[in-house]
Curated annotation (Swiss-Prot):
The lineage of its organism: Bacteria, Bacillati, Bacillota, Bacilli, Bacillales. Monomer and homodimer. Part of the essential Sec protein translocation apparatus which comprises SecA, SecYEG and auxiliary proteins SecDF. Other proteins may also be involved. Part of the Sec protein translocase complex. Interacts with the SecYEG preprotein conducting channel. Has a central role in coupling the hydrolysis of ATP to the transfer of proteins into and across the cell membrane, serving as an ATP-driven molecular motor driving the stepwise translocation of polypeptide chains across the membrane. It comes from Geobacillus kaustophilus (strain HTA426). InterPro entries: Helicase_ATP-bd (IPR014001), Helicase_C-like (IPR001650), P-loop_NTPase (IPR027417), SecA (IPR000185), SecA2_Bac_anthr (IPR030908), SecA_CS (IPR020937), SecA_DEAD (IPR011115), SecA_motor_DEAD (IPR014018). It catalyses: ATP + H2O + cellular proteinSide 1 = ADP + phosphate + cellular proteinSide 2. This is Protein translocase subunit SecA 2. Belongs to the SecA family. ATP binds at residues 85, 103-107, 492.
């Protein structure tokens, strides 16, 4: 163990030394670069691009290019990159995560690799935690890039397609990860290639990379549309499942938010609906409603995961505590919660396109990031994204003191201690920032502060811009502020006059988060750039963290607890126990993310095949459209003959009527009556069919295909692909829902899902061929002049 830790430490130290040497080389360029005029400095961009065109690489020019950006930032912003920022920029250029502490200037550091990679003209994406930060950084850092002759774009929601296209065409584009991901999905739903807004994904730098790639990775991006499936089942299901008991009718894992029906639970639903087997495919809609109702009642929590306001269920962002206007839970979960809460039930949505954040960002040719808290997830970053974490030293030695946790037996005892601490700090004018894990907890604590007569600010339900503005004042003398842990992230808290002498900003964490990294981020709000500061977590066994832990083990540990007169746990060691609980839950979340990634990777691979198929059709030239149509018809006919004339069945038993009907749909004028197909071998039937195919081929070759008809046929093909793909996606979703059942039969559930998904995908491709064939033939009927009587006679059954 110690050997491994020492090895990691040595590797990190070697990396830091290597980067420090490169930073020293950049410093050597400073006198030369600083002597240039503004115009000469701008001209460097042209020179660098010419050198790259002549075959030099980014590594060949990086030292000089970084020196140019540093000088431009000094002239435009009045900010000169510290050596540690140069090191962070170099780490990101190499495709790593630069772990830089809060207040160390990550945003400025990102200008260095962004500029360097933008010189290739492929587009650089800078991903921020929210739209406010995207706008802010685009405006502030964009001044440096524009000064150097590069273009800068902003990609946020509510923009038109043409505005987005312009933003993506820029050398450097700022935006949120979800918006980039949704644009990718929307691009694969367009009906003209020129309507796509994204270029091929080249290089992305992700700010707060752990929040975006890990904490938010459990929620897939989904574009959905109204399904037309009635919502009347949800209230009925709510009346059934509300009486269920854990361990009896259902089992759940609060750490991973998974829930399973027991045999007894399934039987209760079967009795209620008068069916034999809930898991039969004919009852898949019922099973879907049952599982979502279970999640609504026993996983999702009011005022934590969602709120009910004006008769509407509204999602709460788990990281900021902010209500997400206009968003709804997908796949029927929203409707199940509405039934639970007794409000009007909205229409359920069908999934039209989906991707996880993980798989979206893995499509970039090169990825990098920055955060103050990557080390605890070092292994996951490497396993999932092949990203190394490099810890960059601080510019000034840290003067923040992190006190040991105080752990109390009850919530009430914890709040009393928090109030005492705040009063003590407030008496000397020292500012205090109190971090909570949810809006509901913030409000509870605020009420307790008001009762205790403590003046304070409650940072809830604010816009991102207001949050940033208010949290920036948290370091002022006498300030007391309550906020969710992630509120106003990305905003520096500057100390007011005289606050350094009082000890700086003091942070109080009121609960340990499910992730140690978010606790680190809260602590990191104090003691920026060598300022004094301190932090302490004051928590209790009533906190949500312990609700997620094994309750039997928790009870066992509680039975040994000894407290002092204030209710603080003194024995057994509470800090060790808290670390154990947090690690267990973090591991469970890691497993859940791996679970999602394994399943989604199967769907992602299939998505890419379908998206490629769509693009192929949309890219067809006028002369190629009919050939593409014939390709689908040819495949459909081959599959039809094989399906109705199987080798392992006697020809007397073949479904000739079914075959004839299918061929009539494939050829709008199939020349042979049904009796011509009876009592024939497969080869003879195939010969008749392929003769007919050749006639169709010749007829299509004579067909005039103008631009309008070309466009219509392309649209028909793509509409058919989309319709079948949407059904397939929803089918895969149902398969995912029942995956836990496979493990009961000693099957590997992931392998089983992979095999089932593959079989469904083969069926999907066959359905697409059949659909394109039928739809196109129906459309083209009017284009042919045929002998109606002859056609009618041939097509009689």
């Amino acid at each position: 163990m110690f050997a491994k830790v020492k090895q990691l430490f040595d590797e990190s130290a070697r990396e830091v030394q290597r980067l420090a040497k490169l930073a020293a080389q950049i410093n050597e360029w400073e006198p030369t670069i600083s002597s240039l005029s503004d115009e000469q400095l701008r001209q460097k961009t042209v020179v660098f691009k010419e050198r790259l065109e002549r075959g030099e690489t980014l590594d060949d020019i990086k030292i000089e290019a970084f020196a140019v950006v540093r000088e431009a930032a000094r002239r435009v912003l009045g900010l000169r990159h510290y050596d540690v920022q140069l090191m962070g920029g170099l780490a990101m250029h190499e495709g790593n995560i630069a772990e830089m502490q809060t207040g160390e200037g990550k945003t400025l550091a990102a200008t260095l690799p962004s500029y360097l990679h933008a010189l290739l003209g492929k587009g650089v994406h800078i991903i921020t935690a929210n739209e406010y930060l995207a706008r802010r950084d685009c405006e502030q850092m964009g001044r440096v890039f524009r000064f150097l002759g590069l273009t800068v774009g902003l990609n946020v929601s509510q923009m038109t397609a043409s505005e987005k296209k312009e933003a993506y065409a820029a050398d450097i584009t700022y935006g949120t990860g979800t918006e980039f991901g949704f644009d990718y999905l929307r691009d694969n739903m367009v009906y003209r290639l020129e309507d796509k807004v994204q270029r091929p994904l080249y290089y992305a730098i992700i700010d707060e990379i752990d929040s975006i790639l890990i904490d938010e990775a459990r929620t897939p991006l989904i574009i959905a549309n109204k399904s037309g499936i009635g919502a009347e089942l949800f209230p009925i299901m709510a009346r059934i499942v509300r009486t269920f008991e854990e361990g009896k009718e259902y089992e759940r894992s609060l750490e991973t938010k998974q829930i399973f029906l027991t045999e007894e639970g399934a039987q209760k639903i079967e009795r209620a609906f008068g069916i034999d087997n809930l898991y039969d495919w004919e009852h898949h809609v019922l099973l879907h409603h049952a599982m979502q109702s279970l999640r609504a009642w026993f996983i999702m929590r009011r005022d934590v995961d969602y709120i009910v306001k004006n008769g509407k269920v509204m999602i709460v962002d788990p990281f900021t505590g902010r209500v997400m206007e206009g968003r709804s839970f997908s796949d029927g979960l929203h409707q199940a919660i509405e039934a639970k809460e007794g409000v009007e039930i909205t229409e359920e949505n069908d999934i039209q396109a989906t991707i996880t954040i993980q798989n979206y960002f893995r499509m970039y040719e090169k990825l990098a990031g920055m955060t103050g808290s990557a080390t605890p997830s070092k292994e996951e970053f490497w396993q999932t994204y092949r990203l190394r974490v490099i810890t960059i030293p601080t510019n000034q030695p840290s003067r923040r003191t992190d006190w040991d946790d105080l752990v109390y037996q009850t919530y009430e005892a914890k709040v009393r201690k928090i109030i005492d601490e705040v009063k003590k700090m407030n008496a000397i004018g020292r500012p205090v920032l109190i971090g909570t894990t949810s809006v509901a907890q913030s409000e509870q604590l605020s009420a307790a502060f008001s009762k205790a007569g403590i003046p304070h600010h409650l940072l809830n339900a604010k816009t991102e811009e207001e949050e940033a503005r208010i949290i920036a004042t948290a370091g002022q003398k006498g300030q007391v502020m309550i906020a969710t842990n992630m509120a106003g992230r990305g905003t520096d808290i500057l100390l007011g006059e005289g606050v350094k002498e009082l000890g700086g900003l003091h942070i109080i964490g009121t609960e340990r988060h499910e992730s140690h990294r978010i606790d680190m981020q809260l602590r990191g709000r104090a003691g920026r750039q060598g300022d004094p500061g301190s932090s302490q977590f004051i928590i209790s066994l009533d906190d949500d963290l312990f609700r997620l832990y094994d309750q039997d083990e928790l009870k066992k540990w509680k039975s040994k607890v000894e407290t002092d007169e204030t209710g603080r746990i003194v024995s057994p060691d509470p800090i060790k126990f808290v670390q154990k609980v947090q690690t267990t839950i973090e591991n469970a979340h890691y497993s859940a993310r791996l679970h999602l990634l394994k399943l989604d990777t199967v769907i992602d691979q299939q998505s890419k095949v379908i998206y490629h198929m769509r693009d192929r059709v949309l890219a067809l030239k006028q002369a190629e459209v009919l050939s593409e149509l014939l390709r689908h018809i040819h495949r459909h006919i081959t599959q039809t003959i094989d399906r109705y004339c199987p080798e392992n069945v006697f020809f007397e038993e073949w479904n000739i009527e079914g075959l004839h009907n299918e061929l009539r749909r494939a050829f709008f004028r199939f020349a042979y009556p049904i009796d011509d197909l009876r009592h024939k071998q497969k080869e003879e039937i195939a010969q008749l069919v392929w003769d007919e195919y050749k006639s169709l081929e010749a007829a299509l070759a004579d067909l005039p295909c103008d631009e309008e008809q070309t466009m219509r046929l392309k649209h028909l093909m793509v509409e058919t692909i989309d319709a079948h793909w949407i059904r397939h996606l929803n089918q895969l979703n149902l398969l995912k829902e029942g995956i836990h059942l496979r493990s009961y039969g000693q099957e590997d559930p992931y392998r089983a899902f992979e095999m089932d998904a593959y079989r469904e995908f083969v069926a999907l491709q066959q359905a697409i061929d059949a659909g394109i064939c039928t739809t196109a033939m129906n459309y083209l009927k009017s284009q042919f002049v045929i002998d109606d009587e002859a056609a009618a006679a041939a097509n009689k059954p």
